[in-house]
């Protein structure tokens, strides 16, 4: 009797079973929906194509961005549904570039709403005090513009300017080679996508070769990986898992 009851729980001869393609199709569909939800509300991956954030972030770094650091947002309009926090000075953030919404930028938050920002001979002053910018690097001794020269550039001397409400002043750590708020202004709060928090992969390819965002999952990236010699292709193992500060 026990054996009969146990067998009765199994599939009966001739019972209907889902086709192979349907089972895998449903699994792929569920995985796709979960990926969309994670990308829209939780975490999104980005790659670093330029050196404006060196040495904190290098070309070829792949990082994850916490998308709910500053609130749960409408994935279509990027408007905050549920506020959870505000950007803090020193945060490394990804945002929609105000001058071209098709581009995402990554910089460090320097000025908060209401702050008075002034740059004097490369040194950042916030509300009249010299800011602590240990992460910043400079490699060009020339001042642009000179202290008493024409103001056709704002790289090394700027302001003072006051950060508007609901906006932020951002800069790259590679100060002499970063296109940031010194040149195009402030970042509205609605443009923020999230806070960068970890490097999950990092590699260095041949000089002047493009960095493919699809490297980890795309066939083109794999072909490049196996076609390059070991001296041209380098995985930066010491950067994988590094927390972004």
Residue ranges and their predicted role:
Residues 2-22, 37, 41-47, 52-245:
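Soluble "head" domains of membrane/secretory-pathway proteins
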């Amino acid at each position: 009797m026990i054996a009969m009851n146990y067998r009765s729980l199994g599939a009966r001869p001739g019972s209907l079973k889902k086709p192979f393609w349907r089972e895998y199709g449903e699994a792929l569909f569920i995985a796709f929906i979960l990926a969309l939800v994670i990308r829209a509300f939780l975490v999104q991956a980005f790659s670093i194509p330029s050196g404006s954030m060196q040495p904190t972030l290098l070309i070829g770094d792949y990082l994850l961005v916490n998308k709910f650091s500053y609130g749960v947002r409408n994935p279509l309009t990027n408007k905050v549904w549920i506020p959870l926090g505000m950007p803090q000075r020193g945060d490394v953030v990804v945002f929609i570039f105000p001058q071209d919404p098709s581009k995402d930028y990554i910089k460090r938050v320097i000025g908060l709403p209401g702050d008075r920002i002034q740059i004097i001979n490369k040194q950042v002053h916030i509300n009249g005090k010299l800011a602590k910018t240990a992460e910043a690097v400079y490699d060009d001794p020339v001042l642009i513009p000179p202290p008493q020269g024409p103001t056709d550039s704002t790289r090394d001397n700027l302001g003072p300017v006051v950060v508007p409400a609901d906006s932020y002043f951002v800069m790259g750590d590679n100060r002499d080679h970063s296109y940031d708020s010194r040149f195009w202004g402030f970042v509205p709060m609605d443009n923020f996508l999230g806070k960068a928090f970890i490097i999950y992969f990092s590699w260095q390819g041949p000089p002047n070769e493009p960095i493919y965002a699809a490297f980890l999952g795309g066939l083109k990236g794999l072909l490049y990986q196996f076609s390059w010699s070991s001296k041209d292709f380098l995985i930066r193992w010491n950067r994988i898992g590094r927390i972004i500060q």
